[in-house]
Amino acid sequence: MPRRRRVNLKAKGINAERELVHLFHKFGWSAVRIAGSGSSKYPCPDVLAGNGFRRIAVEAKLISKPRKYFSQEDVEQLYTFSKTFGCEAWIAIKFPDTSWAFFNPEDLEETASAFVASKDMIEIKALTINELLEVG
C-alpha cells in the first residue's frame, strides 16, 4: 500500500475515534482516545469511556465494505485489556452515512482464521449509542 494512502486511512481512523470520543461526551460520559493503540506491544483499545458506574473499552472501525475481519489476536487483546482494566469490551463500527453501531465481541462470527462482523450481523445484533449507554 502506498505511503500516502496509509496516512489517509490512518487519519480517517483517528478522526473516527475522535468522533466517538465526542459522542460519549455528548451523552455525559468521559472518554479518551488512546493514541497509537493499534501499534502498541501492549493490549489497548482505541477509546476508553466511563460514567462513574460503567467503564467501556472500545475498538473502533470506520469501514466501507460489508464485512470487517478481526484477527484472533485483536479480539484476545481487547478481552485481555478489558479483563485487566475491569471494563466491558465493545466493538464500534461505522459505515459511511450511518450512525455508530456497537456490539459485543462475542457476536463476531468465527471463521477458520479470523473473526468477522458482517453488515447483516451488525443490523441484527448491534446497539445504538442510546442503547449502549442506556439513555432515553
Regions found by a protein language model. Give the residues of each.
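Active-site metal-binding core of divalent-cation-utilizing nuclease and nuclease-like domains
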Residues: 27-52
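Short, charged, amphipathic alpha-helix that recurs within catalytic cores of restriction-modification
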Residues: 63-94
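Acidic-basic catalytic patches of nuclease active cores, encompassing PD-(D/E)XK
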Residues: 1-36
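Conserved catalytic cores of phosphodiester-cleaving nucleases, focusing on short active-site segments
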Residues: 24, 47-64
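Domain-level recognition of nuclease-like catalytic cores that cleave nucleotide substrates
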Residues: 7-11, 88, 94-136
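Acidic carboxylate-rich catalytic motifs and surrounding loops in phosphoryl-/glycosyl-chemistry enzymes
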Residues: 35-37, 93-96
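Amphipathic alpha-helical interface surfaces
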Residues: 20, 43, 74-78
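Short connector loops at helix/strand junctions that flank enzyme active sites
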Residues: 42-44, 53-57, 73, 84-86
